């Protein structure tokens, strides 16, 4: 079996590529990083180190790579032969890979009519739907029914902390022990693709929201409060009792939303929250506060990790979620000068105030009780 994976970065190698290799696939990575592509071609293997007290090492074999800029025809050829296509390139790169993917899929239809699944493993909601829409922009109306017939774009939720890192061997990658890869069955054509460790479900939305409103919410709040207290890593932040208490408070609020919406068992969800907290304090993973805090404007989105659970909490319970509000206020103070969004956010706040920023980025009306509470907390933290 052949899997073509777009994105040879740490998540691609340490999470998706690793699981695909362990599932029996030959994995061909597609990337534009010359050095990574050269090393993967040369060595055809790499190490994945599990970040726990045992430091277990997995040797991932039967891998190769191609450069999508200089070896375009090879990429297209691999797409025509693939049994599975996956991506881990970042949401903003999906439009860039759509052209070559569309080209490869068009050629494949003429020579190989075996159904094929494409899974965008990105930290976003509906990543494969987004990729499909970009691909469909590149093809003719006549080809669209054929693409619908033979190509299943499967949405998924992925969760594994893979921090920034440097090693003597550039291919080695350290990952946390925990991982979750949940794939929606809705667009499967024929047989379910064999992927060891993946979990196939009928409805992905509860899993996406559970991850977004727990892992991403907690991670974000730890990072912004950590930055506020001038701490360097998420682990340092979570060892600060005040920050840990604030994070737990916010996760109980977002958890109340999830339990109410999906009818989950409250005790089971509290256990999930504690599992997530333990991941954040894993001493074997050093995750920089400024990495986790990056792109604050995107994270202020109306349906994203902070505003999403906060507005839903207010709508469901008629109360202000003070843990989430404190996290949002800390985000509004994130002024890291090497982050373009942080710089732009501070400029917006200076020009239009906190109310203007929340209206522009979060679609919250200026007299909304959440806006009033966030501004009060922001002034208190300042």
UniProtKB/Swiss-Prot annotation:
Alphabetical UniProt keywords: NAD, Oxidoreductase
Reactions catalysed, as given in the entry: D-mannitol 1-phosphate + NAD(+) = beta-D-fructose 6-phosphate + NADH + H(+)
Listed EC numbers: 1.1.1.17
Residue sites binding NAD(+) per the record: 3-14
GO BP terms in the entry: mannitol catabolic process
Keyword match Oxidoreductase: yes
One Pfam family named in its UniProt record: Mannitol_dh
Record InterPro entries: 6-PGluconate_DH-like_C_sf (IPR008927), 6PGD_dom2 (IPR013328), Mannitol_1_phos_5_DH (IPR023028), Mannitol_DH (IPR000669), Mannitol_DH_C (IPR013118), Mannitol_DH_CS (IPR023027), Mannitol_DH_N (IPR013131), NAD(P)-bd_dom_sf (IPR036291)
Gene Ontology molecular function: mannitol-1-phosphate 5-dehydrogenase activity
Protein name: Mannitol-1-phosphate 5-dehydrogenase
Entry's family note: Belongs to the mannitol dehydrogenase family.
Keyword set includes Disulfide bond: no
GO cellular component term, pick one: cytosol
């Amino acid at each position: 079996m052949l899997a073509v994976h777009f994105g040879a970065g740490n998540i691609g190698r340490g999470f998706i590529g690793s699981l695909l290799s362990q599932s029996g696939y030959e994995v061909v990575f597609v990337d534009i990083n010359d050095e990574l592509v050269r090393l993967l071609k040369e060595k055809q293997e790499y190490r994945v180190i599990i970040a726990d007290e045992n430091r277990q090492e997995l040797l991932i074999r039967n891998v190769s790579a191609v450069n999508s800029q200089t070896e375009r025809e090879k990429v297209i050829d691999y797409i025509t032969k693939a049994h599975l296509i996956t991506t881990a390139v970042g949401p903003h790169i999906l439009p860039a890979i759509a052209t070559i993917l569309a080209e490869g899929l068009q050629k494949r239809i003429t020579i190989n009519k075996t159904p094929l699944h494409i899974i965008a493993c990105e930290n976003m909601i509906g990543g494969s739907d987004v990729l499909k829409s970009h691909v469909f922009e590149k093809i003719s109306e006549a080809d669209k029914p054929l693409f619908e017939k033979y190509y299943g774009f499967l949405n998924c939720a992925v969760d594994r902390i893979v921090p920034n890192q440097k090693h003597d061997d550039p291919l080695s990658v350290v990952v946390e022990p925990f991982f979750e890869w949940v794939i929606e069955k809705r667009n499967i054509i024929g047989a379910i693709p064999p992927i060891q460790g993946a979990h196939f479900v009928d409805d992905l939305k509860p899993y996406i929201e559970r991850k977004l409103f727990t892992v991403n919410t907690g991670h974000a709040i730890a990072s912004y409060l950590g930055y506020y207290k001038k701490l360097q890593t998420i682990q340092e932040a979570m060892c600060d009792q005040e920050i840990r208490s604030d994070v737990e408070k916010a996760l109980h609020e977002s958890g109340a939303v999830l339990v109410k919406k999906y009818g989950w068992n409250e005790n089971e969800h509290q256990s999930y929250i504690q599992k997530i907290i333990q991941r954040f304090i894993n001493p074997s993973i050093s995750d920089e506060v400024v990495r986790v805090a990056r792109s604050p404007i995107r994270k202020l989105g109306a349906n994203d990790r902070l505003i999403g659970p906060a507005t839903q909490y207010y709508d469901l319970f008629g109360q202000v979620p003070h843990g989430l509000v404190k996290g949002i206020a800390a985000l509004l103070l994130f002024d890291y000068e090497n982050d373009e969004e942080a710089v732009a956010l501070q400029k917006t706040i200076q020009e239009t105030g906190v109310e203007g920023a929340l209206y522009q980025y979060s679609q919250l009306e200026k007299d909304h009780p959440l806006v009033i509470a966030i501004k009060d907390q922001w002034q208190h933290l300042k």
